[in-house]
Structure formats: C-alpha cells, structure tokens
C-alpha cells in the first residue's frame, strides 16, 4: 500500500507507465497490432483500473491533497490515453465494429478533454487560487485540444456527430487556447 501522502504521485506514475505501454504497442506495425488485440484489451483494463483508483482517491479523505488542478490533470491524462490507444484503429480503416467502438471512445474522450480544460481555464476573476497552476501546464494541453478537435471534425465528416456539436466544442476549444 502506498503512503497516503504519496498516493497522488503514485497515481500519476502508474498512468505514465500505462501511457508508455500504449506508446510501445501503438508504435509497432499495424499488422502486428491487429494480430495481438489481447494486449490492447489488457491496456484498456489497466487504464480502467487506474481510473477506478483515481475515483477511489477522490472519494476518500486523501482527496484533500488533490486540488481542482490535480483533478483536471488526471482527467486529461485519462482521456489522452484513451485517444492514444484507439487512434491507430481510426487510421487503419473506416469499417467494422472495432472502428466504430474506437471512434465512439475517442469522441467521448475528445469532448471530455475540451470540457475539462474549458472549466479549468476561466477568466481570471472566476478562478480559484490553485487553478493558476494550470497555466503552467497549458502548453502541453495544446496537443490535447488539437487532437480532440481533429477527432470531432473526423467524426462529423463521417456523420457520427452533428455539425452543431462540433461547432460548439470547437468554440470551447478556441476559448481554451485563448486561455
């Protein structure tokens, strides 16, 4: 068991281990990846277990060590990992159940990233004192907004999401970029 004072750090470290495994899996040939779907399923399970541990952390008194900033970062990390895990499936083909499942996962994560960042980056007069720290992380969030917007445009082009929804999220993403 991890010391309660280090639990947040442990959660972040575990997430980056999972993220490294996703990168290792997805940087291989698509032919190899498609022959080993069990590894992707195992990573999906590890990511889900990690997120359950994050939610358990938020539900306990240990959460006093986590600010809104930490919650936003953990949420963004979760959804970036989901997109990283599913993105190669989207690039491979536009047919089949695997594509549809990956696209829906990515749409949900794209929406969550933009919504989370938009709520975290508000006009200065509405911020809580700890949310100023998110500004330090912001340059690394640019990719998250970009890929989220790209996924939503891709989904709209194949009629999986309405143009109105995409427009709304693109506007929120632009507000985040203007921070």
Regions found by a protein language model. Give the residues of each.
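Extended, leucine-rich alpha-helical cores of fungal transcription factors
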Residues: 1-49, 62-170
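Helix-capping and short linker residues that terminate individual alpha-solenoid repeat units
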Residues: 51-55, 59, 118-119, 178
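Eukaryote-biased recognition of C-terminal alpha-helical segments
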Residues: 172-179
